A protein has these predicted regions:
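N-terminal hydrophobic targeting signals that begin at the initiator methionine
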Residues: 2-4
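N-terminal export leaders
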Residues: 6-11
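Sec-dependent N-terminal signal peptides
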Residues: 13-17
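Right-handed parallel beta-helix/beta-solenoid
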Residues: 19-45, 49, 60-62, 326-330
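Extracellular beta-rich repeat passengers
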Residues: 44, 55, 59-60, 64-387
Length: 387
């Protein structure tokens, strides 16, 4: 056999193997339509028949009492034709949640979870028990917990462009978002508001990356903490609007390490946030429990009388207490600086951690979006753009 023919046969074999592999992958990743006009009419049926790698496209509409346990790996669920509204209507998978997730990896997009209530007061829109969950463009309202995770050191939760409001049983033990001792929590471009006595966001994760969000307990809000990291861990809190309601029963806006430091590395980086205290008698922007912890707070705007450095030892630089009139329309949560503000251009470099810059490269845009900055962040606070 001559060399050219040998080479040709090798190429043909490679093409055949590649095509077979791609075809097998395509077959494995089935795309399945779910809805009243399809063979699979309910989400519960979809979960019961799911195979690893399946993609479910769920037709828009109301799905009442349609609860499910998902235990397959690499599952994608996305709404098509509009929003998919999941109303618990007194039902809960395994007595826990509208959805209970037990697979290795799952992506959920375009769903509205509401009304999860169970006797133990921990009913959730989603209960994450293992694996990696990505939630994108979803809402969680009037549940006892919006999302609740188990304690699983290998689990990860990513939340993108989503909304959490009016969740909580009212006992202070259930929250808009309640994350246990997992490996990592990432939240970007999301809107948290009006938790019912509980917190807007509570996490015991080893790493918490909270960037470019709006966490504002607004008129009528009764949330406790806006952000709590009771077990410590590493928390990057960058470019967020964080507002405490006038009706809160808890003076603290952000709390860190109150249960003791449970992780090997404990550090809080509070960079370029706008922190607002509406409590009539004044609140406390930051509480940090004593221990082996790094605190760095740079370029934050503080609407209220409290100071960040009252939390204890740390690197506190370039944080400004400001009045309401620095902003375009603070009464409507528009915290863009006015064009004539004397704070413009006064941001400083917040430094690096593990070789990566702490400075924001994006900003939150309401509702539930993130916009990339055209240049570097020049101003203190969460928002760099103007009216």
């Amino acid at each position: 056999m001559n060399m050219s023919r040998t080479r040709r046969l090798l190429v043909q074999s490679f093409i055949g193997i590649t095509a077979t592999t791609l075809w097998g992958t395509a077959l494995a990743a089935n795309t399945i339509r779910v809805g009243p006009t399809n063979a699979i009419k309910t989400i519960a049926m979809a979960a019961a028949t799911a195979r690893d790698g399946d993609v479910f496209e769920v037709e828009s509409g109301d799905y009442r009492g349609d609860v499910a346990v998902w235990n397959k790996d690499n599952i994608t669920l996305r709404a098509v034709g509009g929003r998919v509204r999941l109303l618990a209507d007194g039902m809960a998978a395994e007595g826990k949640a509208i959805w209970v997730l037990q697979g290795a990896r799952m992506t959920v997009e375009g769903f509205d979870f509401s009304g999860a209530q169970v006797p133990d007061r921990n009913g959730a829109g989603i209960r994450l028990e293992k694996g990696h969950l990505t939630v994108r463009n979803c809402t969680f309202t009037t549940n006892q917990n919006g999302i609740l995770t188990a304690d699983n050191p290998n689990a990860e939760l990513e939340i993108v462009n989503s909304e959490f409001g009016y969740n909580g049983h009212g006992d202070g033990q259930s929250h808009n978002l309640y994350v246990g001792q997992i490996a990592r929590l990432t939240v970007t471009g999301s809107y948290f508001h009006h938790a019912k006595v509980g917190h807007l966001l509570k996490s015991r994760a080893a790493v918490n990356d909270i960037r470019y969000n709006r966490l504002t307990d607004e008129t009528g809000g009764t949330a406790s903490y806006e952000l709590e990291f009771p077990a410590g861990g590493v928390a990057y809190v960058v470019g967020n609007i964080i507002q405490q309601s006038s009706q809160t029963g808890n003076p603290h806006v952000i709390s860190y390490g109150v249960e003791g430091y449970k992780w090997p590395k404990n550090a809080l980086y509070l960079i370029n946030n706008t922190l607002v205290d509406n409590r009539p008698n004044g609140g406390v922007f930051l509480r940090v429990s004593p221990g082996e912890v790094t605190v760095r707070a740079v370029n934050n705007l503080l609407v209220g009388r409290s100071k960040l450095d009252s939390a204890g030892p740390g690197d506190y630089r370039n944080n400004f207490n400001v009045d309401w009139d620095e902003f375009e329309l603070a009464a409507r949560e528009d915290y863009r600086l006015k064009r004539q503000s004397k704070l413009l251009g006064k941001a400083i470099d917040a430094g690096l951690v593990d070789g990566l810059s702490l400075m924001p490269d994006s900003e939150y845009r309401h509702p539930r979006e993130v916009t990339r900055l055209k240049g570097k962040a020049l101003h203190p606070g969460a928002l760099q753009s103007f009216k």
